[in-house]
Each structure stands twice: as structure tokens, then as C-alpha cells.
Amino acid sequence: MSSLEPATTAKVALITTKGPIEIELWAKEVPNITRVFIQNCLDKKYIGTTFNKVIKDYLVQTSKIKEPATLKLKDEFHSRLKFNKRGLVGAVHDDKRNSNNVDSLFITLKPTPEFNNNYVLFGKIMGDSIYNVVKINESELKSEETPMYPAEITDIKILVQYFDDLVESKEHIAEPAKKKAKKAKKPRVKLDYTLEDEEDTGFKMKSAHDLLSDSKLSNKLYANKKKGPSENNEKQKTIEKAQDSSMETKKIVPERPDYKGSEEIENETKITSSENMNHETKQDKPNYKAKLDRNPNIDSDYDSDLDLSSSESIDLFAFKQSNFQSS
């Protein structure tokens, strides 16, 4: 320390991706600017900012904090504080008098006498942490003053506060995480397989054969028959009555001179009934008509596809009973 340079009274540490940077502050000589700077450190405002401006072998500068201050600070130049070596920390301004702020700060890498009485000097880098500043200054650049991968401030530690009345701002105090209200769980249905097995032991499956031979079931069916006629019984009786009436009709023969006897009529009736059955069977079957090829040399001139289903027909019995006179 120069014999003319006053002693520092406060101290903070900026933790960066290139290593820690320890800064000692002249809080007594530059009270207003150092007070705001320490308050920003208490509120962790510099966390997340980067050294986005790098001028080789000259200086490095941080980006602005997320919530810049609207209050402009007055110039606090001190006759014993000069930019006469590397590792000095200064406040930025708006290129005019009494417009200083510590939303961003810079660190020199060489003596910069041109900054005297132009920028406010309020701190200096201590110990070996100056080499971490050199690492930041040696970063690869993607443009004239912009680094390819800028170093970032990840944490801040207050080592010597000096201003005892400073506390962390309430709006920056992290609120404890609120516990989420537990949702009422729906009661789960517990399946008791033991009880189900016990209930199933009294149930026995029976086959269809066993059911038919079951005496209880047969008694029920027999009881149902006794209660009254079912629909099937009524149909059976109707069929029997129809058969009896048809038999009586067969026996009745009109008195005609050409009567041939009951046996002959019965045979003819059987033939007629068989023909009727064949006719009904043919009607039940699907009517597939195959197209026939006619030979004009041997086949007669007729329409083989002619539909005669709607023509009048006469059975054999009626044919026998009718008299046809020749004209």
C-alpha cells in the first residue's frame, strides 16, 4: 500500500466461474457509493451478471444488474485515491458529472491515470484473486470487446460489512416454500379374497346332463305340465284336429257313376299329397335358373325361361273327379 493511500474498511468476495475475486472497499472515504454497493451485495443483485466487456490488458467490466437503480450518486473523488496500478475497482457513470451508479463496475488491468477525477475509485483487488481477474481478461473474444464465453458471478459473500445498519432488503429475502395442501386421498377398496373363496365353496356347477337328470328339476317340469296347457300343447292339439278332419274328408266320396272305390281314392290322395310336398320343397329351395343354350336345329321354338308359377294348377284328385267333354 502506498504511503498516501488510506486503509480499507470493508470487504466482499465475488464468486465467479473463473474463481473468487476479493474486493477491499474504502467505505470511510467513499461512503455513499460503497454503501449502495454493499447493499446490492447483501441483496445478491450481482448474481447472474457476467463480465461481458473485456479490453485486453486494460480492464474488464460486468453487465448491469436486473433492477438498475434510478438514483444517481454524486461524485466522490478523493485526493489520496488514484488509478495508478492494476486491480482497482471503479463505478460507472452516464458520461456526465454526478451521474454515478454501481449497477455495473469495472476492474483495471494497468495504471489508468486518465480515469482520475473522472471515475470514482472505491475498491481494490486483494491477494492472489488478481490472477482470476487476469484469467477473465484473457478470455477468447468473439468481437472487439465481447468474450466468447463470459465469466459469470455465481455467489457473493460479505466479509466485512462496515455499515452495521444495512440489512438484506425484504423484497429480496427468499420466502420459505409453501407446502402444498395434501389432497384428500380416496379410500381404497380392499378386496378380501378369503371371504370370496369361502362363499364360493357352497356353489357347485352342474352340467346339462346333471340338470336333465335332476329330480327337482323334473318335478318342476312335471308340475308345470299339470298347471295348464302350454303353447306347444295347443299347437299339437290343433294339428291333431286338422289331421282328423282331413281323414274324414278323405272318406267322404260324392256319389258319382265313375266312383272307383275307397282304396283307389286313398292311393290317389297319397300321390297328391306327395306331389304337394315336393312342390313345397321346391319352393323352399332357392330358385337358381341356369341359362340353357338352345340349338335351333333340334329344339322347338319356345321360351325356356317362361315363369309359370302364377298360372292356375289342378291337382290329380280334382282332375280325376272332373268330367271333360270333347268339343
Curated annotation (Swiss-Prot):
Q: Where is the composition biased (Basic and acidic residues)?
A: 228-269, 277-296
Using the UniProt annotation, give all residue ranges assigned to the region (Disordered): 223-307
Q: Which GO terms describe its biological process?
A: mRNA processing; RNA splicing
Reaction(s) catalysed by this chain, per the record, are: [protein]-peptidylproline (omega=180) = [protein]-peptidylproline (omega=0)
Cite the SUPFAM superfamilies for this sequence.
Cyclophilin-like
Question: Where is the protein situated, by its record's location annotation?
Answer: Cytoplasm; Nucleus
PPIase cyclophilin-type domain: which residues?
Answer: 8-158
Main subcellular location: cytoplasm
The record, for Gene3D superfamilies, names:
Cyclophilin-like (2.40.100.10)
| Enzyme Commission number(s) of this protein | 5.2.1.8
Keywords for this entry? Cytoplasm, Isomerase, mRNA processing, mRNA splicing, Nucleus, Rotamase, Spliceosome
Q: Name one GO molecular function term.
A: peptidyl-prolyl cis-trans isomerase activity
UniProt cross-references to InterPro entries, sorted A to Z: Cyclophilin-like_dom_sf, Cyclophilin-type_PPIase_dom, Cyclophilin_A-like
Q: What do the Gene Ontology cellular component annotations say?
A: catalytic step 2 spliceosome; cytoplasm
Can the keyword Membrane be found in this entry's annotation?
Answer: no
One Pfam family cited in the UniProt record for this chain: Pro_isomerase
Q: What does this protein do?
A: PPIases accelerate the folding of proteins. It catalyzes the cis-trans isomerization of proline imidic peptide bonds in oligopeptides. Involved in pre-mRNA splicing.
Among PANTHER family, the record links this protein to:
PEPTIDYL-PROLYL CIS-TRANS ISOMERASE-RELATED, SPLICEOSOME-ASSOCIATED PROTEIN CWC27 HOMOLOG
Q: How does it assemble?
A: Associated with the spliceosome.
Q: Provide the family line.
A: Belongs to the cyclophilin-type PPIase family. CWC27 subfamily.
| Protein name per the record | Peptidyl-prolyl isomerase CWC27
* Origin organism lineage: Eukaryota, Fungi, Dikarya, Ascomycota, Saccharomycotina
Q: Which gene encodes it?
A: CWC27
